[in-house]
Amino acid sequence: MIEHRHEVAGDEVVIRVVETEDDLEGFRDFIRAHLGFLGLDSETTGLDIYSDDFRCRTVQFGTPHEAWVVPVELGPAYEGAVIDALKAVNGFVLHNASFDLQVFERTLSVPMETMWPKVKDTRILSHLVDPRGKDEGGIGHSLEETVRHYVDSEVADKVKTLMADLAAARKGVTKATIWKKVELFDPVYNLYAGMDPILAARLIQKLAPLVKVRDELIDNEHRLAEICSYMERQGFLLDVEYTEELSLDLKVKESHYNEVALNFGCEKINSTDQVADVLESMGVRIIGRTPSGKRQVNDDLLSKLVMEGSPEVSQFAEAVIEGKKAGKWRKTWVDTFLKTRDSQNRCHASINPLRARTARMSITGIPAQTLPSGDWIIRRCFLADEGHKMASVDYQAQELRVLAALSRDKAMVEAFLNDEDLHLKTARAAWPDREITKDSPERKYAKTVNFGRVYGGGAKTVAEQTGLDMAQAQQVVSGFDRAYPEVQKLSQRLQREAIRNGYITTPFIDGLGGRRLPVDPQRAYSALNYLIQSSSRDVTARALLRLHDAGFTPYLRLPIHDEILASVPADHAEWGAKRIGELMAEQMGPVLIGTDPEVGGRSWGSLYGAEY
C-alpha cells in the first residue's frame, strides 16, 4: 500500500492507495467503519463514457481526513471490492454525481437507479447557495471553484491543477489525453484522485448550513439530475448515412464559397480583417466598430449587403455568409455527431438541469438549444427508435403565461382565459386610433414588447429590434404598461426587493422554487426577467418529475427550454404525445400553462418540414 499525506485547511489528511489484493482487506475495514456516509469519486480515461474504449481506472472513497484509492483497472478482485462498497455504504457525497454514477453503471454494472437515492451532489448544493457563475460575480460551481472559496484556496490552486501540470510536463500529451496515459501509481495522479472524495466530504460540511431553501427543493433538484442522467444514458439515435452525406455536402458547399471569396481576394472568410479589406476595396463604408475598435463585419451588415449591395458586393457577402455557415454547421455539429456516437450509433448529450443564475437547463453534445430555429437540416440527423415516431410537446407562450400568473394582471389573465391574441391586444392598446389586425405590422411590434418586457427590455430594446424610432417604441411600451398595469407593479416590487436584499426569491410551487436569485442593485430592472425565466424553468422541471413518475422517462430524449422531445411507439404515437402534453400542462394560479403536442415522422427534422 502507498500512503500520501497532505494538508487541507490546516489538517493533515492521508490518502491510501491500494497496490495489491492483500491491501483490499484494509480497504474493506475502512468501508465497514464508515457505512453511514462517504465522499466518492472516480478517475477515468476521459469524458466519453459511452465510447468502446472508455475505462474506469480508479474509484476513491473518503472522509474529511482519509481517502482510499482502489485501482479497478487491475482486474476483478479490485472491481468486486468497489462494487461491494458501493452497495454497502448508505450515503455518498459527490461533485457532479451524474458523471460518476454513469461511469459506475457503464464499467462496473452498478445501476444508477440503486445509487441515486443515497447520493448528495455538492454541485447542486453550491448552486442553491449561489447560482451565479464566476463570470457573473459569483463563486462558481466547479469543484475547483467551490473548494477555493469554501475549503482551501491553496489546495484548489495547487492540487486541482495537478493533472494539467502533468500533461504540460509530458511531450505530446494534452489535458484531454493525460487521463488515459498517466501511470496508474504515479504519485501526483494518486494525490489528485485521493483528494477529491476528501474535498467532497469537507465541502458538504461547509455548504449544508448555507443552503437556505426547503428540503423538498433539494430533493427534487437531485431527482431532476437523476432523470436527466437517464436521458443521457438512453442517447439519441443518429442517422449515420444521412449525417455522412450532409457532412460531405457541407464540405463541398464550404469549398465552393471559399473559392468565390478567393476570387475577390479574400483567402480566409473567417478573418474579419480580410473580409473588411475586400468590402472597403469595393467601396463599402464600414461604420460599426467592435469594443476593441476594429471594423465590425457581422451578419446584419453582410445580409444587408446581399440585399442592397452592388452585384459584386452582394455575391461576395453571400459567399462569406454561406461559406462560414457551412463550415460552422459541419465542424461544430455534424462532424461532432459522427465522431462522438457510440457503437450503437447513439449520441449522448450532457444535460445540466441546474444552470445559469436562473437555473435554466443547458445541453451540450447535442446543442438543441442553439440549433437554427425552424431549420430541419441538422435536426434531420436524429431519429426516433425503430418502430417509433418523434413527438414534440411545447408550452403555449410559457413565459407570458407565467408572467400573467405571477403578476395576476386581470387583463392579461383574461386574455389567456378567453384565448385572445395577446400581441393584438397590446398593439391596439398602443395605437387605439388605428385599425389593427393579426397581419398588421403593429402586432409584430407589440409581440416584441410583450416578450421584451419578460426579458426586462424597454423602449431602447424595442427600437433596436423593430426599427421603430424611439418615440414610436416608447408609444408601444406605454401601451403595454397601460394594458397590463399589474406587470409594472410586480416589476417595481421586485426591484425594491432586489435593492433591499441583493436578491429576489422565486415562488415555491409543488416542490420547486423558493430559490434566491442574486440581482445587481445597479441592474434591478433585471429582477422581473430572472423571476419569469426561473419560474418558467421550474414549470418544465415539474413536468419532467411528473413524466418520470408516470413512467415516460425511457421515451424522453431532450428537454429544450419550453419543449420536451420524445421517441414514442408509432402505433400509440398520437396517444403518447397527447398524454405527455397532459402531464406537462400546469395550472399556475389563475392561468393554465397548456401544451401543443405534435407527432412527426421518424426524424426529429420531420417536425420542422423534413420528409422522413
Give the residues covered by each predicted segment:
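Short amphipathic alpha-helices in soluble, non-transmembrane regions
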Residues: 576-584
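Conserved catalytic core of nucleic-acid polymerases
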Residues: 284-286, 307-310, 348, 353-356, ...
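Active-site-proximal helix-loop-helix substrate-binding element of RNase H-like nuclease domains
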Residues: 2-19, 48, 52-208, 296, ...
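Short alpha-helical scaffolding segments that buttress acidic/His motifs in well-ordered protein cores
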Residues: 123, 147, 189, 224-231, ...
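Short hydrophobic/aromatic beta-strand micro-patches
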Residues: 465, 565-569
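Conserved "right-hand" nucleotidyltransferase catalytic core of DNA-directed polymerases
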Residues: 1-25, 32, 37, 42-44, ...
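Helix N-cap motif at beta-to-alpha junctions
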Residues: 470, 569-574
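Conserved short beta-strand edge segments in small beta-sheet-based binding/regulatory domains
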Residues: 587-599
